Amino acid sequence: MKTIASVTLPHHVHAPRYDRQQLQSRIVHFGFGAFHRAHQALLTDRVLNAQGGDWGICEISLFSGDQLMSQLRAQNHLYTVLEKGADGNQVIIVGAVNECLNAKLDSLAAIIEKFCEPQVAIVSLTITEKGYCIDPATGALDTSNPRIIHDLQTPEEPHSAPGILVEALKRRRERGLTPFTVLSCDNIPDNGHVVKNAVLGMAEKRSPELAGWIKEHVSFPGTMVDRIVPAATDESLAEISQHLGVNDPCAISCEPFIQWVVEDNFVAGRPAWEVAGVQMVNDVLPWEEMKLRMLNGSHSFLAYLGYLSGFAHISDCMQDRAFRHAARTLMLDEQAPTLQIKDVDLTQYAYKLIARFANPALKHKTWQIAMDGSQKLPQRMLAGIRIHLGRETDWSLLALGVAGWMRYVSGVDDAGNAIDVRDPLSDKIRDLVAGSSSEQRVTALLSLREVFGDDLPDNPHFVQAIEQAWQQIAQFGAHQALLNTLKI
């Protein structure tokens, strides 16, 4: 079978310019998803193209992804990234991945031993919020999670990311090997502390002495990641095949823009990512808050209200005058004033975001962005709302966004079509929706303390604003509610 590894590729395709035989698995990565392929792995590939070296990546997937891993192996661990801009495309073959392991194809034991190899310096992760097994209400390890329960009972055969990391670090310590840096690359707030809490929480349950050693010798840098990477579709894969002249089932499409801000705190070395444009900084938090509120908050706003209004893609929303105006107003009038970042022109940042959202070459589905809203809402919208409540400033679009989420998870769009709601709390949400009338819906969903905390449901100003926004959507539909809120 012909693959990108076995054919002569067209001249316009950018192939690796370095010696891949020199690569070692110095980075082990959890989660060979679309975002990682178009972001961290691609940036590492850029470093290798610039200066060579041995910073290869071993990709790990546990209980899914076996078909993707088999396909990756069949093409010598190469895959394609298509960067789609409004002005043209770039086709890139990424060669930074030199190995992959999967629990079904290989074994859990082989995966854990991979973490224990002497050359491993960084373990990076893109496993989504759910993968860290953290209780969102406390920020601590969720000891009621079935995988955590399993790992505490059988610690040498762990099934969770925290369990595997702790077991690997335990073995490295026993063998006299240096520890590795644990690098979360997930788009969640304070991701370095999230993974640190998960790992130390698991280690404390197993051995306080081990937890102390990890705390002293392992680093957990924070990161801010940014690139719009839609999930692969048959259509996007077919388009990439036309560029290549051969199929690549591991290929992914994305926008041209890319940003990675990384706390420069590594215990065993790192690639020279700054060569690829990565910003190595002392404190990631201001960058993270800017991105989560202005980009991700607006993305979620467009996803919920856009889906309800019948728009399938973010770029479709941006063709609509009201949605485009709302996105800009939300960013600059409601989200930007809540930030504390220096030396960044937030107006310019907002206009760049508008242009990225409007990119017609990207088909980023509103339904995809709307997934897992119960875990995204707190940092994307509610954090800014809390600041506005303290200042008594206007946050009417944020209120409409929260009400839009409530309407979306109620399971029916404005045309009366059923919505396939994907959320970690979907069972709980479904029960609350089924047990409440439209008039009671806001009160019912505000009982989700893991989303709204204890403070917001008890704040009469917050409750009143969300109820008013809900009534607007319920009475007029999402699009007209948006026009009413904007007064246009």
Q: Where are each of the predicted segments found?
A:
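Substrate/ligand-engaging "lid" and interaction regions
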Residues: 1-488
